């Protein structure tokens, strides 16, 4: 996957991959991919068609055989068809309105429910809430994560589409996540850009 995403980091200036790092050990415990509001178009970088859409084949010097190999183990339904439908939904919601887009957000299993995901969310939320007017945000969520996003102000727009327009707590499903005070919290976790690391180690 890293090889497929490398051109997004090299040639798409408004794409950010960040990681959560445990301060005591330097261990990576989660990561997030954000597309910033400066991006002029809506076309998910995970779609195979992004190669042609963004001109990555020429920029990376890839052959057709290399591209076929990179996508040989990938479900077209999950990675192209569904992401295409999601892009259409996002266009319907925002049109040309600048916004932040989250995909993906991952926390290593042993560190889930310990605040890592919120740190990765806050990296962009803090920036979105500093603008005037506030910059909206968008994501698609698995059913098991809906409450996490609602707790920081994301409002459902369908089965798994969410929009956030400023600070709020959307009452309802977030209660299923339990009391934050009862969760085991991590020691200090920092959030860092990981573009340089992925470029240096494309097999990651």
Task: Name each model feature, range by range.
Residues 27-106, 112, 167-204:
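Conserved acyl-donor/pantetheine-binding loop and adjacent beta-alpha core of acyl/acetyltransferases
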Residues 104-107, 113-126:
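Conserved acetyl-CoA-binding loop-helix of GNAT-fold acetyltransferases
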Residues 150-159:
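Conserved acetyl-CoA-binding loop of GNAT-fold acetyltransferases
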Residues 1-17, 21-25:
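Active-site rim helix/loop that mediates acceptor-substrate recognition in acyltransferases
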Residues 98-102, 127-141:
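Conserved GNAT acetyl-CoA-binding A-motif
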Residues 105-112, 137-148, 162-169:
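Conserved beta-strand-loop-alpha-helix junction that forms the acyl-donor binding cleft
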């Amino acid at each position: 996957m890293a090889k497929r995403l490398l051109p997004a980091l090299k040639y798409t200036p408004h794409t950010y991959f960040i990681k959560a790092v445990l301060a005591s050990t330097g261990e990576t415990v989660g990561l997030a991919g954000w597309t910033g509001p400066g991006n002029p178009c809506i076309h998910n970088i995970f779609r195979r068609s992004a190669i042609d859409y963004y001109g990555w084949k020429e920029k990376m010097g890839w052959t057709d055989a290399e591209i076929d190999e990179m996508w040989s183990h990938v479900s077209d339904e999950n990675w192209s068809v569904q992401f295409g439908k999601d892009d259409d939904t996002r266009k319907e919601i925002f049109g040309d309105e600048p916004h932040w887009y989250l995909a993906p957000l991952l926390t290593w299993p042993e560190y889930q429910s310990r605040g890592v995901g919120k740190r990765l969310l806050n990296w962009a939320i803090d920036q979105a809430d500093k603008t005037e007017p506030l910059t909206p945000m968008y994501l698609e969520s698995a059913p098991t994560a809906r409450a996490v996003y609602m707790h920081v102000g994301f409002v459902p727009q369908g089965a798994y589409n969410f929009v956030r327009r400023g600070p709020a707590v959307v009452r309802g499903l977030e209660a299923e996540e339990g009391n934050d005070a009862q969760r085991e919290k991590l020691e200090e976790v920092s959030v860092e850009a990981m573009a340089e690391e992925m470029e240096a180690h494309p097999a990651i």
